[in-house]
Amino acid sequence: MEKPRGVEETPSSEPMEEEEEDDDLELFGGYDSFRSYNSSAGSESSSYLEESSEAEHEDREAGELPTSPLHLLSPGTPRSLDGSGSEPAVCEMCGIVGTREAFFSKTKRFCSVSCSRSYSSNSKKASILARLQGKPPTKKAKVLHKAAWSAKIGAFLHSQGTGQLADGTPTGQDALVLGFDWGKFLKDHSYKAAPVSCFKHVPLYDQWEDVMKGMKVEVLNSDAVLPSRVYWIASVIQAAGYRVLLRYEGFENDASHDFWCNLGTVDVHPIGWCAINSKILVPPRTIHAKFTDWKGYLMKRLVGSRTLPVDFHIKMVESMKYPFRQGMRLEVVDKSQVSRTRMAVVDTVIGGRLRLLYEDGDSDDDFWCHMWSPLIHPVGWSRRVGHGIKLSERRSDMAHHPTFRKIYCDAVPYLFKKVRAVYTEGGWFEEGMKLEAIDPLNLGNICVATICKVLLDGYLMICVDGGPSTDGSDWFCYHASSHAIFPANFCQKNDIELTPPKGYEAHTFSWEAYLEKTKAKAAPSRLFNMDCPNHGFKVGMKLEAVDLMEPRLICVATVKRVVHRLLSIHFDGWDSEYDQWVDCESPDIYPVGWCELTGYQLQPPVATEPTTPLKAKEATKKKKKQFGKKRKRIPPAKTRPLRQGSKKALLEEDLQAAAKAPSEPAPDEIITVRVKEEHLDVATADKALSPELPVPVENIKQETDD
């Protein structure tokens, strides 16, 4: 039978390479089932990973791989970083980008001692392997698994990752145990999820249009009594983000055994995977007697059908690699005073989201954001553009914190999302001009605002008119190309309620009268970035969204309104006053199943049952705010998130509430836990079409009753 497209012959050296892999896996304390992932990738996966650095170079030359910060530089690139005079460098072992002066050894080839030793160890293994194969030794031995190792780490963490962050937030499988059942939620209410292709910052967004209804996959058979893991073919009935509703072949129109699955898991494979990896196809016990000729049945069902690309999981893992590493330093907005930045260190990277620790703060003084967030900048950005920064020395008591012990370089500018270039000729924003802007302290409001200061590189300091601060501490920095600022009368033209300055009524506010009274002028409409892509979002679509007032939380949410490229996000179970405006390309919204894919804790909708009224003192204590300003939220007692500063008090209240609660929850009750996090990497992957694969059915095995 013809071999499926994209499958290569296994190199003759594969047994020896597998032995080397087994040696490496001893790092995980003898975790045997990880080997199943290696075999599941197939022989073509092994050779792909071991030669990925060469293949990636060829693909980039052919224009097939997107440019990423890691691909912008090579170890010998003699370019200087922005105004710093330091040469950039790339670690030859892990690929991390940094400054040459901060790298290890005289040659500056590695970012740390561990990378240098790993490179040396792998080179020796490669040299020994070459001699055993009768090949002459070379001056520079090829490093075994150089590119594959991070992929294996990613797959291992994805399939078996457990644990907690320092703040107690569960990760990996620990987080999924506390997870939310998207499948039941969508099916019970007939909700529609936003497609993955709407989110440009998530894994494989540019290939998800190939995932369609009727597609065939090979999936783990959970209705079998055999001692080993067996598989069966299933059809995609419905797609919802990364999750799909599957039905085993043979059930035909019977939906009673349909089940939801995340396509990012390692138990879903393209047709032909079982044949390549000598896995057994066994029909579910429920229907095993329905047909006597399963081979013939599958031949009819599979001919001409579509399936996943052969390298689907390889590309998934590759797209979940991120350039930021623990210990990198950067500048981030000060959450206690948004008009300035502070120095911070990357503590954790999960799915492209960064947990940052302020250098002059406590161990729990953190800030969450995506690596493409406009709130973070390379070291030196504030000084260069004229933005305020808090100058303080690093706390001596933080010197022993694990993250601060790993500081080895500043995050280089190439790692940050680039802003649009601006041209100031022919008129530009001026100090005192009026406009409309999303209130950074209350993201559900679009307010009348003023340009307080014009910075360099197109950045503007904006303040909301009528704000409580008179010292400029509530000014906020927006770039001129930001989609959070709008020309005057934008809200009126799009039927959005504008929040007027203090002393004005929304229904009587007039821009003309206000400009005349304040003797100011409106910023010209031509200066604003009003481009609107065909983003694909529609009212009612479900997604996972960051609560920007408490950015460590990702919640179940709904697109409430679409105004050009502006989305009004409603958090399910919360009042409308907590809705937030975000851009359609915001890195703070994710497709259904993203948290499950990355191991981040998803916050379910708030329970709707009535709660006991809070005492005034308790209510005051439970209020929480984002940047220490206006925004306040009082979640119900059962679902409020744990805060580091009041763990003891909250724990006592939770124990009292648990004592009064019934021993078992109602069947349809949703129990929410306000914690969360994530794990892994992300980037964009090259586009691959879903091939029509031949039908490998020789290995179908009939299951018999014991």
Swiss-Prot record:
This is Lethal(3)malignant brain tumor-like protein 2. PANTHER family: LETHAL(3)MALIGNANT BRAIN TUMOR-LIKE PROTEIN 2, POLYCOMB GROUP PROTEIN. Gene3D superfamilies: 2.30.30.140, 3.30.60.160. It is found in: Nucleus. Residues 15-26 have a biased composition (Acidic residues). Residues 620-635 have a biased composition (Basic residues). Its main location: nucleus. Residues 1-85, 606-669, 685-706 are annotated as: Disordered. Part of the E2F6.com-1 complex in G0 phase composed of E2F6, MGA, MAX, TFDP1, CBX3, BAT8, EUHMTASE1, RING1, RNF2, MBLR, BAT8 and YAF2. It comes from Bos taurus (Bovine). MBT repeats lie at residues 180-284, 292-392, 398-501, 509-605.
